[in-house]
C-alpha cells in the first residue's frame, strides 16, 4: 500500500508472548482481491467498507502528479461467508482525486473518520524540506446526499503525520497513529477523547508498554475493549505483525501479545478488524500466495 512519497504513511522490544489462538482459526483470501491493494475492511450496519485504489474505466490505478496511486473507500455487500460483493466507490464532491483511506465509523454509521493528505506543506526536519503530511478528517452521512461536511480534526498539525483513526466501541475515544513531538518510535499510538463527534480533548500518547522503538500503525478496538494494532517491533514473525492489548487491564507492566498463525504470517499483517461476535473479522496482508498487492482476508473461529 503506497501513499504519496512526500506524505509519509509510516506504516509502516518489548518482549512478545505467543497469543494462543485455537488451531481451528480459519483464514481465507477473499475473491475481491487482485493485483491492486485492498485493506482496512470495516463492517457497518451489515455492509463492508474497505480501502482500495482509485481506478480508471480500463481498470488501471489512478496516480497523482507524483506518480503515486490514489486511494478511495469502497462499500460492498457482506455475504454470509465473509466475501464482499458488488463494491462501489463512495462518491463525494469533497473527495475528488484525493487520498481517502483507512476509515473508522460510528456505530450508527453516521460519522466517518479517515486518513487523507494535508493541502498545506509542513516542515520535515529530518529531510530539511516541506512535505505534505497525512491528516485525519471527519465526514458526516446525510440521507440523500451521502458523505458531506468534511472537516479536518483540530489537532492535526501540518508539520506532523496523523493517520489510521479508530473509534472505541462507545465512540468516546479516538485512537490514531502520529509522529508528533514526543513520539519515541518511528510512529506511535495516541488517543483523544471525542464529544458528540464535534469536540476533542487533549492528545495523549499511549504507554511505553504499548508503543515501541519501532512503528505502530492501524489501531482497532474490539467490542470487548481490546486494542489491536500492527508493529514491526523486534521478535515478530516477519515484517508487520498484529498485536493485542487488553485496555481493561490494571497491570501497568502488561505488554502487547503477538497473535499466532494463521492471523500473523511471515509477511506484513495489518489492519485487524473483529466483528462484535468476537469470532469473525478481517485482516489485510502481504503474504505468500497473495494476489500481488495488499490483500483482504476473512477469518472465523477466532
Region annotations inferred by a language model:
Residues 1-23:
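Bacterial Sec-dependent N-terminal signal peptides
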Residues 21-302:
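Short, conserved micro-motifs composed of acidic
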Amino acid at each position: 500500500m503506497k501513499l504519496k512519497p512526500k506524505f509519509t504513511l509510516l506504516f509502516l522490544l518489548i518482549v512478545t508472548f505467543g497469543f494462543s489462538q485455537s488451531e481451528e482459526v480459519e483464514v481465507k483470501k477473499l475473491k475481491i482481491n487482485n493485483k491492486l491493494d485492498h485493506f482496512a475492511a470495516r463492517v457497518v450496519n451489515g455492509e463492508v467498507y474497505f480501502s482500495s485504489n482509485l481506478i480508471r474505466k480500463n481498470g488501471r490505478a489512478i496516480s497523482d502528479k507524483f506518480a503515486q496511486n490514489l486511494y478511495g473507500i469502497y462499500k460492498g455487500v457482506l455475504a454470509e461467508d465473509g466475501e464482499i460483493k458488488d463494491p462501489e466507490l463512495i462518491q463525494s464532491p469533497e473527495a475528488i482525486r484525493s487520498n481517502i483511506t483507512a476509515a473508522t465509523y460510528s456505530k450508527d454509521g453516521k460519522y466517518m473518520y479517515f486518513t487523507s493528505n494535508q493541502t498545506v506543506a509542513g516542515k520535515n526536519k529530518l529531510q530539511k524540506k516541506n512535505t505534505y503530511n497525512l491528516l485525519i478528517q471527519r465526514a458526516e452521512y446525510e440521507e440523500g446526499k451521502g458523505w458531506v461536511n468534511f472537516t479536518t480534526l483540530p489537532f492535526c498539525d501540518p508539520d506532523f503525520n496523523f493517520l489510521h483513526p479508530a473509534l472505541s466501541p462507545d465512540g468516546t475515544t479516538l485512537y490514531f497513529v502520529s509522529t508528533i513531538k514526543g513520539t519515541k518510535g518511528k510512529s506511535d499510538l495516541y488517543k483523544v477523547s471525542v464529544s458528540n463527534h464535534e469536540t476533542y480533548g487533549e492528545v495523549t500518547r499511549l504507554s511505553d508498554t504499548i508503543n515501541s522503538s519501532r512503528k505502530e500503525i492501524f489501531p482497532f478496538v474490539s467490542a470487548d475493549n481490546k486494542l489491536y494494532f500492527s508493529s514491526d517491533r523486534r521478535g515478530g514473525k516477519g515484517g508487520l505483525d498484529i498485536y493485542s492489548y487488553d485496555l481493561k487491564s490494571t497491570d501497568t507492566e502488561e505488554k502487547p501479545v503477538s497473535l499466532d498463525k494463521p492471523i500473523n504470517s511471515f509477511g506484513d499483517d495489518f489492519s485487524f478488524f473483529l466483528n462484535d461476535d468476537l469470532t469473525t473479522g478481517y485482516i489485510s496482508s502481504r503474504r505468500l500466495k497473495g494476489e500481488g498487492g495488499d490483500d483482504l482476508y476473512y477469518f472465523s473461529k477466532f
